[in-house]
């Protein structure tokens, strides 16, 4: 009798562990479940967003002020962290740009390797430090080539 009880308890514990393991692998919320249709995920995400978060997705601040380079690494700037906290911005424009307007140069701007690190650092910060973890939309203007260090710029007609 005692042997049956022990086996039953062991089986129950194992099944609980297996169920817990599967539960950890599945997204907890609908909008994060990649197996569901996009329309379902979008509707779920929009229903969870506050008005402030929805407006924040429409903001498009200048991105070249949103990172700091330290040695050979890139980190979100305090200005970026405050922007995300206060305004819930969902987009940055010209993060990788380097020209006289941005005051980014070969020594202060992002080369291709640092640009990758910057994009990853900014995305990681937003995903890990916002309520819903919505990734940033990083936009660049490139009508005649991308104005970034290590990029090709093509001549344009006057």
Where are these regions (language model features)?
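Bacterial Sec-dependent N-terminal signal peptides
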Residues: 1-27
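N-terminal beta-rich core of secreted/periplasmic extracellular enzymes
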Residues: 24-158
């Amino acid at each position: 009798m005692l042997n049956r009880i022990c086996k039953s308890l062991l089986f129950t514990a194992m099944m609980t562990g297996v169920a817990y393991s599967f539960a950890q692998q599945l997204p907890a919320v609908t909008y994060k479940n990649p197996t569901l249709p996009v329309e379902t995920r979008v509707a779920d995400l929009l229903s969870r967003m506050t008005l402030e978060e929805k407006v924040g997705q429409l903001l498009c601040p200048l991105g070249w002020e949103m990172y700091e380079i330290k040695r050979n690494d890139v980190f979100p700037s305090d200005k970026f962290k405050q922007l995300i906290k206060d305004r819930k911005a969902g987009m940055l424009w010209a993060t990788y740009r380097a020209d006289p307007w941005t005051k980014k140069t070969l020594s202060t701007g992002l080369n291709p390797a640092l640009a990758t690190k910057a994009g990853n650092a900014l995305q990681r910060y937003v995903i890990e430090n916002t309520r819903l973890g919505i990734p940033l939309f990083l936009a660049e203007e490139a009508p005649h080539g991308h104005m970034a260090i290590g990029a090709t710029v093509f001549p344009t007609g006057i």
